[in-house]
């Protein structure tokens, strides 16, 4: 099973990716992880990427595509893979197509912006342990305090409303063209066309996961 997972920040992609990977015995692949691993291993592509990143520049699509090809040739990709946060652009999507790297399904988790803002703005974190609470959905026993240590909880900068709205704006700007690219390709069919699956990301984690898995099992 080869899957591309799309969805806004705060949509629960990480949780759902883990469920998909477990069900189909496939690895979750993100470009960030690939870059870090290649730089750490000192591979030729990793060295190229390090030079670019050290100069404060964006890593080119050519390098990213090279890393993707290397990564999906690894033995753990025998059953497929899940791309998380890749492709980010039409150029990268076209690059996958040109390399003959086809996927079975593109899953888009849709959540209204206001729901995302509410979810993320309500998150509170215990810095020492990383324990996460939510003021409405998973509140601590005592307001503003960690259940285990009693230490104060904080709101991460990333979870503040203004930041969340900015990130959502960037997501829509970047991802809408990809949504159209893959949904059009799926509708037209043809060689290598994936199924395009839209999942409403509202409801319990288990409910959303079950809906995704039942759709993927038909892909």
From Swiss-Prot:
GO terms for biological process: AMP salvage. One of its GO terms (cellular component) is cytoplasm. Its EC number is 2.7.4.3. Residues 129-152 are annotated as: Disordered. GO terms for molecular function: adenylate kinase activity; ATP binding. Residues 133-152 have a biased composition (Basic and acidic residues). It is found in: Cytoplasm. It catalyses: AMP + ATP = 2 ADP. It comes from the Bacteria. ATP binds at residues 10-15, 123, 132-133, 203. Disulfide bonds: none annotated. Residues 122-159 are annotated as: LID. Catalyzes the reversible transfer of the terminal phosphate group between ATP and AMP. Plays an important role in cellular energy homeostasis and in adenine nucleotide metabolism. Consists of three domains, a large central CORE domain and two small peripheral domains, NMPbind and LID, which undergo movements during catalysis. The LID domain closes over the site of phosphoryl transfer upon ATP binding. Assembling and dissambling the active center during each catalytic cycle provides an effective means to prevent ATP hydrolysis. This is Adenylate kinase. It comes from Alkalilimnicola ehrlichii (strain ATCC BAA-1101 / DSM 17681 / MLHE-1). The gene is adk.
């Amino acid at each position: 099973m080869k899957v591309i997972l799309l969805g806004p920040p705060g949509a629960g992609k990480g949780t759902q990716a883990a469920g998909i990977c477990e069900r189909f015995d496939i690895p979750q692949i993100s470009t960030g992880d690939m870059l870090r691993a290649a730089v750490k291993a000192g591979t030729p592509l990793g060295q190229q990427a390090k030079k670019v990143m050290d100069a404060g520049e964006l890593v080119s699509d050519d390098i990213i595509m090279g890393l993707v090809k290397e990564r999906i040739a690894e033995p753990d990709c025998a059953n497929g893979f899940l791309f998380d946060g890749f492709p980010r652009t039409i150029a990268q999507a076209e690059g996958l197509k040109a390399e003959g790297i086809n996927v079975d399904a593109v899953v888009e988790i849709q959540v209204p912006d206001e729901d995302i803002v509410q979810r993320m703005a309500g998150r509170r974190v215990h810095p020492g342990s990383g324990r996460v609470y939510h003021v409405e959905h998973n509140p601590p026993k005592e307001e503003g305090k960690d259940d285990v240590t009693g230490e104060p909880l904080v709101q991460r900068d990333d979870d503040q409303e203004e930041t969340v709205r900015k990130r959502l704006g960037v997501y829509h700007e970047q991802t809408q063209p990809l949504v159209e690219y893959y949904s059009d390709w799926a509708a037209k069919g043809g060689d290598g066309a994936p199924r395009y699956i839209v999942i409403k990301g509202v409801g319990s984690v288990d409910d959303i996961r079950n809906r995704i898995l039942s759709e993927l099992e038909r892909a």
